[in-house]
């Protein structure tokens, strides 16, 4: 029997999500791993499918910046859609067997997997033939509203991208766009339909089981990811703020970053951050938990090595004395725009943004 390995990742920056899809699809293509289902949430983001029209983004650049929403072009089907907190995004990365190699059937099966979950909460939903996605209300009805977007990509019967189910989503953000280019109908969420917020973990559990049922597969839960911390060391406030960047030694990549490190056995993220701060800079200063946890793939390994990282900030006096540890060969205090330009990973940039907000 086929198996589907389910990864429940929490928050994933969008560009990290694209990297995960690429790595898992390559791993599947090369026979290094089996089918996987990635379940996650993205920060506010607008994505453009292959059929997207730019005019379906109705918000100005200033409005997008205010909401912290970036725009990405993708190779999935469909028009423009929104991703954000409270929305469960699923990326099935399946190599379809010969008896399932039909694009329309695959889309119907994704829809059915979502519809079965909605039914568990008493929500009746279904497809509308002329529009993609999962809908509440009939075609042509004045109250027809989309509850889940579907946008997939298939290459040699290997699937990527997937679905976005509005669970506890802020529906006001859909006013930034014409969702999927459809002006005649609205959007909704499970929270709006039921009048209460739902535990995301319960919906994830139901989705994982539903996909395994629809795709005749046995469920396997992914092993826990490696756990790491990032620490933005900052001195000064506002426009005068300066961020400590350290350069990894050439044999460790040679790039600039904020402080990072792995959790050791028995450590909490805060304990690991305090230890890394002292080991890598000689500083012993109180930490601020940024309430920022996200997942990503470490490097380009196949199958991917998953990491879950917690972000912290440290505010130090102007005369703070930095003494580099063995992992780095240089450090600089730079302004925030320079730090954001130099940092190679979105998660590190987000740590700096939060630390200097």
From Swiss-Prot:
Keyword Secreted: no
Annotated substrate binding sites: 76-83, 149-151, 162-164
Residue intervals of the Nudix hydrolase domain: 224-356
PROSITE patterns from the UniProt entry: BPL_LPL_CATALYTIC (PS51733), LIPB (PS01313), NUDIX (PS51462), NUDIX_BOX (PS00893)
Disulfide cross-links: none
Residues of the active site: 180 (acyl-thioester intermediate)
Keyword Acyltransferase set for record: yes
UniProt gene name: lipB
The protein's Enzyme Commission number: 2.3.1.181
Domain of life: Bacteria
Family named by the database record: In the N-terminal section; belongs to the LipB family.
Key words of the record: Acyltransferase, Cytoplasm, Hydrolase, Multifunctional enzyme, Transferase
Gene3D superfamilies: Bira Bifunctional Protein, Domain 2, Nucleoside Triphosphate Pyrophosphohydrolase
Note, other: In the reaction, the free carboxyl group of octanoic acid is attached via an amide linkage to the epsilon-amino group of a specific lysine residue of lipoyl domains of lipoate-dependent enzymes.
Subcellular localization: Cytoplasm
Signal peptide bounds: none
Molecular-function GO terms, alphabetical: hydrolase activity; lipoyl(octanoyl) transferase activity
Residues under site feature: Lowers pKa of active site Cys: 146
Pathway where it operates: Protein modification; protein lipoylation via endogenous pathway; protein N(6)-(lipoyl)lysine from octanoyl-[acyl-carrier-protein]: step 1/2
Protein name: Octanoyltransferase
Short motif Nudix box, span: 261-282
InterPro entries attached to this UniProt entry: aa-tRNA-synth_II/BPL/LPL, BPL_LPL_catalytic, Nudix_hydrolase, NUDIX_hydrolase-like_dom_sf, NUDIX_hydrolase_CS, NUDIX_hydrolase_dom, Octanoyltransferase, Octanoyltransferase_CS
Region entry LipB domain, spans: 1-222
All residue ranges annotated as the BPL/LPL catalytic domain in the record: 31-219
């Amino acid at each position: 029997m086929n198996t589907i390995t389910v990864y429940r990742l929490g928050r994933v920056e969008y560009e990290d999500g694209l990297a995960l899809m690429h790595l898992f699809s390559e791993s599947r293509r090369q026979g290094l791993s089996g089918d996987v289902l990635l379940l996650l949430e993205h920060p506010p983001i607008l994505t453009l499918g292959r059929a997207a029209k730019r005019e379906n983004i109705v918000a100005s650049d200033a409005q997008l910046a205010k909401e912290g929403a970036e725009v990405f072009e993708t190779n999935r089907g469909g028009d423009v859609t929104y991703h954000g907190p409270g929305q469960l995004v699923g990326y099935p990365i399946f190599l379809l067997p010969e008896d399932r190699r039909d694009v329309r059937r695959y889309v119907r099966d994704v829809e059915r997997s979502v519809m079965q979950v909605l039914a568990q909460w008493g929500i009746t939903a279904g497809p509308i033939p002329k529009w993609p996605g999962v809908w509440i209300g009939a075609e042509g009805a004045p109250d027809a509203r989309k509850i889940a977007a579907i946008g997939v990509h298939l290459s040699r019967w290997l699937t990527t991208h997937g679905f976005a189910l509005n669970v506890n989503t802020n529906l006001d953000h859909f006013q930034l766009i014409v969702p999927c280019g459809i002006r005649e109908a609205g959007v909704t969420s499970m929270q709006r339909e039921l009048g209460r917020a739902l535990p995301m973990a319960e919906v994830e559990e139901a989705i994982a089981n539903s996909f395994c049922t629809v795709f005749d597969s046995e469920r396997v839960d992914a092993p826990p990811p490696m756990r790491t911390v990032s620490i933005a060391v900052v001195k000064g406030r506002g426009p005068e703020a300066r961020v400590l960047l350290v350069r990894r030694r050439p044999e460790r990549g040679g790039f600039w970053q904020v402080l990072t490190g792995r959790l050791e056995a028995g450590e909490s993220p805060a304990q690991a951050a305090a230890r890394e701060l002292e080991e890598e800079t000689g500083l012993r200063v109180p930490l601020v938990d940024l309430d920022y946890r996200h997942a990503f793939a470490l490097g380009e390994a196949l199958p991917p090595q998953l990491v879950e990282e917690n972000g912290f900030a440290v505010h130090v006096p102007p005369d703070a004395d930095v003494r580099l540890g063995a992992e780095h060969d240089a450090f600089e205090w730079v302004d925030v725009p320079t730090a954001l330009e130099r940092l190679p990973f979105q998660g590190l940039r987000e740590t700096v943004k939060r630390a200097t907000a």
